[in-house]
Amino acid sequence: MLFRSLVCLPNGAPKCEVCPLAAQCKGRAAGRAEQLPVKTAKPEKTLVPVTAALITGPQGVLLQRRPSKGLLAGLWQPLAFEGTAMTQPELDAALRAIGLCVQWQAPLQSTRHVFTHRIWQISGFCGTAAGPAPEGCVWASRAELNGEYAVPSAFAGIMRQWRPE
């Protein structure tokens, strides 16, 4: 345990009288003990646009697995493109490039998820598709979502918009 967390209090009077290092303390010698420790300012959170595609079909909802390293590593999510706010035609072109032909229905209601260092502003579109899932994706039923596929809470607002037929 760090004794300084109990002695050098950032928002209170320091307890120099019980500190075993008081004789060597440069802050106390300079008369600055009440101003220490100096708290560093938290960095600004970066706003990151994310475009999601909530694609449903006869087998359920289409999910893709996130990369094995990084934010939300290995979890499942609806198809999503981090770092870009895409229009429906741009999203359609990106999905056609991976072999997915989508019948678009409506825009998704935007959601926001706050992480410690970034804020995801998630928007997108919902639609239907059929056929095999593209590489790296699976079709998941609602029952499978409750047990087999872990979807991060960042996408909870998007997933709530899934209305299975």
Regions found by a protein language model. Give the residues of each.
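Intrinsically disordered, low-complexity, charged terminal extensions of DNA damage-control enzymes
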Residues: 3-165
